Design a protein with these regions (language model features):
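Poly-acidic low-complexity segments
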Residues: 3-7, 37, 54, 66
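Mixed-charge, Lys/Arg-enriched low-complexity segments
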Residues: 41-73
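A short, structured beta-strand/loop element
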Residues: 16-47
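Negatively charged, low-complexity tracts enriched in Asp/Glu with abundant Ser/Thr
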Residues: 1-20
Length: 73
């Protein structure tokens, strides 16, 4: 999971904090709490048309980002 990074951020276009998920310094996804549910937005990869990495690893990163976001409110 060393290629992934999770950043909890306050963005000007969001009321609540978000969890940004990056892979090799490029943003892959964002988890937000703008509604009563957690929502994930997955971004396309401009250079290659798609992202490719281990499903198990990505699931772990998503869960870690979710837990960090919930912990900070």
């Amino acid at each position: 999971m060393e290629d992934f990074r999770i950043t909890i951020a306050s963005l000007p276009d969001r009321e609540n904090l978000v969890a940004e998920i990056s892979y090799k310094n490029k943003q892959v996804a964002e988890i937000n709490q703008e509604t009563n549910n957690l929502i994930i937005q997955i971004y396309s990869y401009k250079d290659n048309g798609y992202w490719e990495f281990s499903l198990e690893e990505f699931q772990k990163v998503i869960e870690e980002a979710k837990q960090k976001l919930i912990a900070v409110g």
